[in-house]
Amino acid sequence: MKRNIDSFRKGLIDGIPIALGYFAVSFTLGIRGGDVGLKWYQSALMSATNYTSAGQAAALSILEEGGSYIELVISTLVINLRYLLMSAALTIKLSPKEKTGMRMLMGIGVTDEIFGISIAQKTPISPLYNIGAMSVACPGWVLGTALGGIMGEILPPVVTSSLSIALYAMFLAIIIPPARENKV
């Protein structure tokens, strides 16, 4: 029992930096949702059901261009297929004694970042570690989108358009430091 609590707590702690990063990215997606005509709560609902910036960005582009819901669903499914593979890779590192329900619960919130910290854990990993990380990271994602959507409805367009470049700035902030250290 103590091991389970410790695993969950470690997941919570390891999920905090992920939640902060998610907040920044999803904030811009919330603003972008408003730009294509969604209310803040619609953008937040999209984030609550789709924990991927690529999937949401594609969905927003399809909505903006007047695409059909079939196109939106197919695009999102194709973009998110990688999570099926990530979930399968994580189950290999689980104890064979883990119940199917825990395995499925663990797979619901797999994202690139949560997969990364989970797969780095020693074998066998605990589903509670993954669930702990999801418990803080996923609400950070949804909250960021909701607040971005609210701010997008309040702030003037000139401000929101400048905030929408934050997503690109974050990618540069992630890429540039390692690129400086690992010159090829």
Task: Show the residue positions of the predicted features.
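Helix-loop-helix junctions within the multi-pass membrane cores of secondary transporters/permeases
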Residues: 73-164
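Membrane-helix interface "capping/anchor" motifs
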Residues: 176-184
